[in-house]
């Protein structure tokens, strides 16, 4: 029995300690995301979007031209400061006015809890500056929006950001679910129903007269 206890002590105890150490050192992606805060990121990107403040765009139809570049006046623009930037991810974010009373759209400093920037516009390799056109997706709901871009490192973690002014937001008119084609189809069916009813009444009237 004593010998068995010694084996347990020599083999399993070190293994248990190793597992504990590995568990303590391991950081899950969720935990890493929870540690990312917007207030801790350098505002190192300049982001511009083509819509004017207050302009209304239509989901599934209108396009936005987005440009981004390294902020030349920021401390992050020092030589080589952006060496760790590997990609830029651009998102469409609910403006403050469209967050009021809607917890599912609420902005949060802890980016793992942020619900304002739900719509991914694009992601492209970091090259100091970029420009692209985005057609507003059909599933973007009616609301006011602004654009935010994140600089990502090699692991995909957000390390810097930039955004258009939330106060100069533009609007998107979402698709209500009743499209023009549906309205046309409904009109055709309605006309067909009236015509069919008229034919039926005429035939019934002829039968009675016989």
From Swiss-Prot:
<feature type="transmembrane region" description="Helical">
    <location>
        <begin position="182"/>
        <end position="202"/>
    </location>
</feature>
<keyword id="KW-0732">Signal</keyword>
<feature type="signal peptide">
    <location>
        <begin position="1"/>
        <end position="23"/>
    </location>
</feature>
<comment type="similarity">
    <text>Belongs to the NAR2 family.</text>
</comment>
<dbReference type="GO" id="GO:0010167">
    <property type="term" value="P:response to nitrate"/>
</dbReference>
<dbReference type="GO" id="GO:0005886">
    <property type="term" value="C:plasma membrane"/>
</dbReference>
<dbReference type="GO" id="GO:0015112">
    <property type="term" value="F:nitrate transmembrane transporter activity"/>
</dbReference>
<keyword id="KW-1003">Cell membrane</keyword>
<dbReference type="GO" id="GO:0042128">
    <property type="term" value="P:nitrate assimilation"/>
</dbReference>
<dbReference type="InterPro" id="IPR016605">
    <property type="entry name" value="Transptr_NO3_Nar2"/>
</dbReference>
<keyword id="KW-1133">Transmembrane helix</keyword>
<protein>
    <recommendedName>
        <fullName>Probable high-affinity nitrate transporter-activating protein 2.2</fullName>
    </recommendedName>
</protein>
<keyword id="KW-0534">Nitrate assimilation</keyword>
<keyword id="KW-0472">Membrane</keyword>
<keyword id="KW-0812">Transmembrane</keyword>
<dbReference type="Pfam" id="PF16974">
    <property type="entry name" value="NAR2"/>
</dbReference>
<comment type="function">
    <text>Involved in nitrate transport.</text>
</comment>
